[in-house]
Amino acid sequence: MSASVSPLAPKHYPAMPVIHGVRIATAAAGIKYKGRTDLMLMVFDRPAEAAGVFTRSLCPSAPVDFCRRNLVHGKARAVVVNSGNANAFTGLKGREATQATAEAAAKAIGCATTDIFLASTGVIGEPLDAGKFSHLLGDMAESATEDFWTEAAKAIMTTDTYPKVATETVLLGQVPVTINGIAKGAGMIAPDMATMLSFVVTDAPIKADALQSLLSKGVGSTFNSVTVDSDTSTSDTLMLFATGTAAERGAPEITDAADKRLADFKKALGRVLKSLALQVVRDGEGARKMVEVEVTGAKSAASAKKIALSIANSPLVKTAVAGEDANWGRVVMAVGKAGEPADRDRLAIWFGDIRVAHQGERDPAYSEDATSAYMEGEDIRIRVDLGIGRGKATVWTCDLTKEYVAINGDYRS
């Protein structure tokens, strides 16, 4: 957790409503950080429906492997998250640490280890000593409360400068249901199937298979469309849980993601996921500017997204944004190197509402002064139209500053 809060941090945080059936506790275990919480326990009073997406890294952490195995059962009684150590690339010791943590949590809750989900975030390659915190889980289970969402978000932070929370309330049938989410992430952000760590809970009575479909579809335009540094973590975990307690108030049980009664819920879930994903980008390590990259006129949506990510991940584009330099030539470069269909002589580029390039050359009306003034803002929009199709995509990133280098150069110090 950084000593100074990102200038892109939210000015206000939402009041996080209670979701019946889930309670949360945090603790300071001293895993890496001193003087702050670094352990979070989420308890479901009754088995909750569970869905998840995880990193596609071929070097996944021990907790990711553990979660994948347990997700087959589709039920959850608890989630344990530690920060300061990723428990990744830790071999047998890592697997033993996950098992010890799961057994301690299962004992504290009174359930099987197959109902436990785990996540760890922090340094890769250092063995995790579960003995530092497993003994705390019993007291945490007893003291857990329904209104600890923001504190939970703080406990899972690493180099984050602020907690990331989001909430939505929407009607399912005629009954209000709530969706709450927390996330962490500031570096090693280029998710592929998930984000760094994010946990979303609803009281809607939605079965696991339907939840999984909703989540898998929802990540495409949210968490899978953000990047800070193009590095996909070994620990990426995004989980969605449903306590189902809204059924007690008359909410209908949903078993199929195609159920038309889910229309408003899907939109609300999308807003929660997008809010959390963009908060991660806005807290990118050392970030001073948020960047939206929109690509239109591509051969396909998939092609548009690859080109958008080529722009968003380009160190030259990102440093130009950091330096408030209207260097649109670097955008041309990033389009050209993406390996996707493009026609130089049909290409158009905008910074904000200012068209800077058109039909293979600088726009005749280009104004360096106007474009440079635009680059001084905190929120930068780069739009590219390829003019060869109807495919479109939007991704989000941040600038690349000297602070990013300093943070990561000193990460293990």
From Swiss-Prot:
Its EC number is 2.3.1.35, 2.3.1.1. Disulfide bonds: none annotated. The record marks 194-195 as: Cleavage. It comes from the Bacteria. CDD domains: OAT. The record marks 121-122 as: Involved in the stabilization of negative charge on the oxyanion by the formation of the oxyanion hole. Belongs to the ArgJ family. This is Arginine biosynthesis bifunctional protein ArgJ. The gene is argJ.
